[in-house]
């Protein structure tokens, strides 16, 4: 490394120091998904970011999705995916594959990436330590012709109803980094597949996390000119939904952010997971890397 490169690194570390001190001993939940999960280079950068958070005294917790991988496995096994109102129906055979893919292959791949940095990651799902309990999701859809709402039966798709933070508190006091798959049991004995965004929001809310980061395939919330909005209050976010600035798939993402804040998260960030080291850029730089939503 040249003297000039060393000088640049030293300057960057000096600039990051106040933010390292701000987040020391604080919990940051990161929902890992989107394009970053399918790109080896971005995956390694993400693992490096999580390791550096831990080394800086932060308590990072990773929650991950895996929709495309689930779809690919179902296709390989010759199981046709069924959808209701645009949402995947998860029957008994499908939920077994969902658990196998999420809590098995994907979870362990992420754990291995983080472990390669020298840190200790541990793979979990909602079943471990009775961490999360779920119940059958109650989803409705409005018929555009009759304007009548009907209930969707999505099978074993669940909503989080309870989070027990005991295991996560224990891990926070250790050197372990939890990597959690969004699968959880119900009190009825069934296994439920849970949307990874809402699962991450429930975990972050139960822990009163300082930050919840959603890694997506977009820079964050954009205004009508296509420019990134750096910060929004909950009231401002709701107004942008109402006037159509926030639309399409960004609406449920922002609504999940709002629910997480109502549950106790101090701030939620939507940022671009396709940018290498976006987690560090968000946490350890002055202007962050995405859209911060606060109370």
Curated annotation (Swiss-Prot):
Pathway(s) per entry: Amino-acid biosynthesis; L-arginine biosynthesis; N(2)-acetyl-L-ornithine from L-glutamate: step 2/4
Gene Ontology terms: biological process: arginine biosynthetic process via ornithine; L-arginine biosynthetic process
Transmembrane segments: none
Protein's UniProt keywords contain Nucleotide-binding: yes
Record's catalysed reaction(s): N-acetyl-L-glutamate + ATP = N-acetyl-L-glutamyl 5-phosphate + ADP
Keywords carried by this UniProt record: Amino-acid biosynthesis, Arginine biosynthesis, ATP-binding, Cytoplasm, Kinase, Nucleotide-binding, Transferase
Site (Transition state stabilizer): 31, 253
Compartments, record wording: Cytoplasm
EC number: 2.7.2.8
Entry's Gene Ontology cellular component terms: cytoplasm
Record function comment: Catalyzes the ATP-dependent phosphorylation of N-acetyl-L-glutamate.
NCBIfam families on file: argB
Name the record gives this protein: Acetylglutamate kinase
Species of provenance: Rhizobium meliloti (strain 1021) (Ensifer meliloti)
